[in-house]
Regions:
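Catalytic phosphate/metal-binding cores of nucleic-acid and nucleotide-processing enzymes, i.e., regions
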Residues: 2-42, 50-53
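Acidic, aromatic-enriched beta-alpha/helix-loop junctions
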Residues: 32-75
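Short, compact, well-ordered microdomains
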Residues: 59-97
């Protein structure tokens, strides 16, 4: 997957987003940066196995509103499946960009 950039409005901030792949297994990662270019948050979780093409795991244990913002912006959509991650569950989503 090549680098894809986007902007995301979340919690009153305009963030620059990058969709790329984790280096080890190649699963997609969404990293968000603030207006100064500093890392803001990572929206995804890397699992120890490869995901099917076009899918990403979005963590919501701390920030469910982040998933809503990503959906509203047309970046991802929920598949309806969740994946246990530690003591929480994360949402399996389709990448739309």
């Amino acid at each position: 997957m090549s680098l894809k950039e986007f902007t995301l409005d979340w919690r009153g901030e305009t963030l620059r987003g990058e969709l790329r792949t984790y280096p080890h297994i190649g699963n997609p990662v969404i990293q968000l940066y603030d207006e100064e270019g500093m890392p803001y948050t990572t929206a995804s979780i890397n699992l120890p196995y490869s995901l099917p093409e076009g899918l990403i795991v979005i963590r919501t244990s701390e920030n469910n509103s982040l998933l809503v913002a990503l959906e509203t912006a047309g970046i991802v959509e929920r598949t309806g499946q969740t994946i246990p991650v530690g003591y929480a569950c994360a949402h399996l989503c389709r990448v739309l960009i």
